Amino acid sequence: MSAGTKASELRELGNEELLAKLREAKEELFNLRFQAATGQLENHGRLKAVRKDIARIYTLMRERELGIETVESA
């Protein structure tokens, strides 16, 4: 993911792609936390950006679950 994924970009993705993005973001967050703990992290703002990306993905998934947002078929 880039410096921060926009919600509009995430809305264009299907459910499977969203789950893949979520897995990637969680893995990146784990790696960033590990780097921070060992003193190797240079960009601390990236932690915040990845956490927000994860929150955006969870929000979008919940909207779809409740029927607020529908999956657009391409």
From Swiss-Prot:
InterPro entries: Ribosomal_protein_uL29, Ribosomal_uL29, Ribosomal_uL29_CS, Ribosomal_uL29_sf
Entry GO MF terms: structural constituent of ribosome
One biological process term in Gene Ontology: translation
Coiled-coil region(s): none
Pfam family of the protein (one): Ribosomal_L29
GO cellular component: cytosolic large ribosomal subunit
Organism domain of life: Bacteria
Keywords for the protein's UniProt record, in alphabetical order: Ribonucleoprotein, Ribosomal protein
Segments traversing the membrane: none
NCBIfam families xrefs: L29
Family per record: Belongs to the universal ribosomal protein uL29 family.
Name the record gives this protein: Large ribosomal subunit protein uL29
Lineage per the UniProt record: Bacteria, Bacillati, Actinomycetota, Actinomycetes, Kitasatosporales
Gene of this entry: rpmC
